Amino acid sequence: MLKKTLIGFAVAVTVGASFAQTLTPIKISYQPSLYWAMPFHVATEKGWWKEVGLAPEFSTFPAGVPQIAASAAKSWDVGGTGSVPAVLGHVRFGIKTIGVTNDESAGNALVGSGKKAAEFAKDPAAALRGQTITLTQNSTADFAVQSCLKRYGLKKSDVVMKNMGQAEIISALSSNNTDLAGMWAPNIYTVEEKAGAKVLCSGKEGGAVVPGALIARGDYAKENPQNVAKFLAVYLRAWKWMGANQKESIAMMKDFYAKGGVSISEASMKKEFDTRPTFDLGQQLKMMERKNSNSQVDAWFAQISVFMRETGALPTIPQVQDFVTDEYMKLVQADPKLREFATSSK
């Protein structure tokens, strides 16, 4: 009896070890406590990485610029970031944009203190001209703010831009050390709820489309296309599930945001869902399709590339076709099992 038990135990261990060996490590980078990063948390809680044979190793960064810089040391393989750092990442490190995390045009904005908001309501241009705006340079918030300046007939040279991390900006607004800031959600909701700040103009109101980017190191994607496709399938499935289970998703969001030190009301969490369109596999493929001209995603990233050239962040305007690719989304679509996995809301 003892012998049979030992044999059974040995078989179980062998099977477990064999299964563990089938899991391929993949290094995933993102910025914590952000709406578009929620799928990574949901997928981990649901055990979906294992289902496609991946073992994720996560690394987080406070903003996109340090995140893309870390790719030079191969600190990560795939991930999500803002569209502005995604373009910068291509130019500096050969990073590919392989999909869109969400439309965050309403989630990047020019924010003002209560006092400044009152001035802005009377005369936006006068309230902004000559003022200092604290923001994180080369970010989606930077893009949104400069789009808003154009809306009111102003140029970058009409204001003073002061570079700060988002945590510093929250502190500055809360202590009345700044009146104007470029921010992204959920930091926007934090200062609205805790510092009485107001959104003066979102990227959407400024006429800008601000997509988030799913990214991969160029060399990693070329050598491991199936791993990249599996990564995308897991990410897309998480969005499908979140869309079908918003109440449970908000509960998970509360935990995910708290881990990154963010505490906002449930109403603000719901606003994340209501104002940030996300895209399933079919929509991703349609947005990235190049028939006889540039795709919709090409147009979005071309606008961002022009902005970055105008601000001096880039020496020339890169060709979008050199870094935006639907190759890996197509791999998901072409694999029946991956396609079914990616489109399931269960």
Q: Which role fits each region the language model picked out?
A:
Residues 1-7:
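Bacterial N-terminal signal peptides that target proteins for export
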Residues 168-266:
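Pocket-lining segment of extracytoplasmic ligand-binding domains
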